[in-house]
Amino acid sequence: MHTTVRRYEGIDQSRKSELAKKVGENLLPRLSKLPGFSGYYLIDADKDVMSSISFFDTSAQADESTRFVASWLREEKLENVVPNSPKITDGEVIVHKTNGAFKA
C-alpha cells in the first residue's frame, strides 16, 4: 500500500467549509474510482492549513492521484482557496493497523 500526504498551506479560512464540501461531494467520488484507490482523509490541520492522506495499491497509482487532484483543483477554479502547491510526502506503508471502527 502506498500513501500520499499533501499539506496545503495558505488556505482561505473563510472558504474551508466550501472546500471540504466540494472535496466530499465532487472530488472523493471521482478519486475513489481511480485504480488502486483504498482510502482518503481530509484534515483541518490549522487556521490556514489542510492536509490530505490518500491510500493506493501502488506507487504509480498514488502518483496519478496527485496529478488528478491538482487537475481537479484547477477545474474547480479553487486557486484562490488553495493558492499554494502542496508539500507532498509519499511512500510505501510499512506498518499499519486499523480496528475497522474509525468514523470521521
Residue spans for each PLM region:
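Short S/T/G/P-rich N-terminal loop/turn motif that feeds into the first structured element of a domain
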Residues: 1-50, 57-71, 80-104
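Short catalytic/binding micro-motifs of nucleotide second-messenger systems
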Residues: 75-77
